[in-house]
Curated annotation (Swiss-Prot):
It holds the Pfam family Insulin. GO terms for molecular function: hormone activity. The gene is ins. This is Insulin. One of its GO terms (cellular component) is extracellular space. The keyword Disulfide bond applies. Insulin decreases blood glucose concentration. It increases cell permeability to monosaccharides, amino acids and fatty acids. It accelerates glycolysis, the pentose phosphate cycle, and glycogen synthesis in liver. One of its GO terms (biological process) is glucose metabolic process. Keywords: Carbohydrate metabolism, Disulfide bond, Glucose metabolism, Hormone, Secreted. Belongs to the insulin family. The lineage of its organism: Eukaryota, Metazoa, Chordata, Craniata, Vertebrata. It is found in: Secreted.
Amino acid sequence: ADPQHLCGSHLVDALYLVCGDRGFFYNPKGIVEQCCHRPCNIRVLENYCN
């Protein structure tokens, strides 16, 4: 998957998709910086899974 900009509900949807049953902790400051302001990939999202 190519890195992409994910903001707002798109970011939350992507976290649900990547983390599934594990769930995730939503740290807007960190993840918005990494995935909305700059493009990020799935590995970055996985860091936010529980």
